[in-house]
Amino acid sequence: MTAASRANPYSIVSSEEDGLHLVTMSGANGFGNGKVHTRRRCRNRFVKKNGQCNIEFANMDEKSQRYLADMFTTCVDIRWRYMLLIFSLAFLASWLLFGIIFWVIAVAHGDLEPAEGRGRTPCVMQVHGFMAAFLFSIETQTTIGYGLRCVTEECPVAVFMVVAQSIVGCIIDSFMIGAIMAKMARPKKRAQTLLFSHNAVVALRDGKLCLMWRVGNLRKSHIVEAHVRAQLIKPRVTEEGEYIPLDQIDIDVGFDKGLDRIFLVSPITILHEIDEASPLFGISRQDLETDDFEIVVILEGMVEATAMTTQARSSYLANEILWGHRFEPVLFEEKNQYKIDYSHFHKTYEVPSTPRCSAKDLVENKFLLPSANSFCYENELAFLSRDEEDEADGDQDGRSRDGLSPQARHDFDRLQAGGGVLEQRPYRRESEI
């Protein structure tokens, strides 16, 4: 039996689009049989895949005044081109304002008259027109100091304006530098290197149906105190007939047990056990295909370099949740280290033995679950890994015609018959909660 033929019972999903079609139909005892059908059209997202909220504000009273009242946050939030335009205009306006003031002082003092008709010291040396006053304003605020133009003791008001312009220039510089640094160091940019799987999956874990999705960190720098949470968002009508378009329900990811706090060094599968307290308790595979809800997942933590809190968000619509699938392993042990293969991060494989019924029916009707010793994809991968190691060691004695040793063939037959679980091999399962 070849490796390719052994992998045939499992359908590998390589993309989100393919995953929407690999859905099993009902079979005996509530289990699927691998048939294919299509899903309904997607609803509008509340949170996009990139974490942006799909909302638009309208009819806000005094919006401009409120945004201007919090000018610093406004400058940090707006786009770079608008922020640079605002500061450029601020500098230009201050130069023009003080240039006009120095020009008015020169006119009032008679400094613009011909030199032979003045007979007194000017307020600002070498200022004979508005352009010269404007250049003096720029030199004062930027401390260029060419040396041709300077204020004298003749006019105290000119001295006062030089001091005032220096203070205004420092304020603008400080505000601009602070806004630029805050914008560059914003922790939300760290969220660009935090990854969520394209799909969530529902599968059995320790005899219970669980909702699972995968998170990963693309940088070697850690997310300190990382923790996850999730909410189910769906429309609801109350007992009084009130319609709530986006009702938010918490989804437990192990808060009471501390399982929501994760060590995000390698990709981790987040797990929500579908029990009596879960909003998904009564949802079966058929309900999932027609239901209208969205699961918003959030990963929070502190950036190691700056200790600032960052948040990464994503969401899964009902048609992005693959029932009866599991994630492919991405973490492998290789020589003296662990290797993470991100090409498998979004991939899933189908588990035909997953019950099609809801977790509620599974508990109440006591459907028979597959044996804990049944052959699974991870065991098959470990089996192939051991086979490859045997070949690398040059142990070719006793090989059968299809490339397997008698002991390997015995293990394989025993696993297919449900006789036991393959012992742990160098290729191991991914880190999971």
From Swiss-Prot:
Binding-site residues, K(+) 2: 143-144
GO biological process, one term: protein homotetramerization
Organism: Homo sapiens
Binding positions for K(+) 4 per the UniProt entry: 145-146
Motif window: Selectivity filter: 143-148
Site (Role in the control of polyamine-mediated channel gating and in the blocking by intracellular magnesium): 173
Top-level taxon: Eukaryota
Residues annotated as binding K(+) 3: 144-145
Membrane-spanning intervals of the chain: 78-104, 156-183
Stated name of the protein: ATP-sensitive inward rectifier potassium channel 12
Intramembrane sections: 130-146
Keyword Cell membrane on entry: yes
